[in-house]
């Protein structure tokens, strides 16, 4: 961090602020403290007739790799709404009966991943801007 996003000062220091125990970027001019917290990724493990829906990534990172539909959680939504949105964006599929399934802390990339177990409403899915292929696998 080179400049304070509150006052524009370049008087930034990476230090432990008062009453804290972790180093953070602090502005020495306006006394703002900047917290770096993990990003939340939300997704779904979708099933239909004992098969799992996977999508082949059409974007970086991991271009060309098969994965579960998932993406970054938005401020204005619930985790469940985020899983529904991401599944539709990446596969074109509608899902139902969402139940919490797994939670992973990926500290090496500062992310928390939350997945739901879900059912496909019907087997309508296909490629999207984010996925070059979408298929059900056994």
Describe these PLM feature segments.
Residues 13-14, 54, 97-102:
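A short linear hydrophobic-aromatic micro-motif
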Residues 16, 36-37, 57, 125-128:
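Short histidine-centered beta-strand/loop micro-motifs
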Residues 47-89:
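Conserved Nudix-box catalytic region and its N-terminal flanking loop in Nudix hydrolases
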Residues 73-138:
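Unchanged
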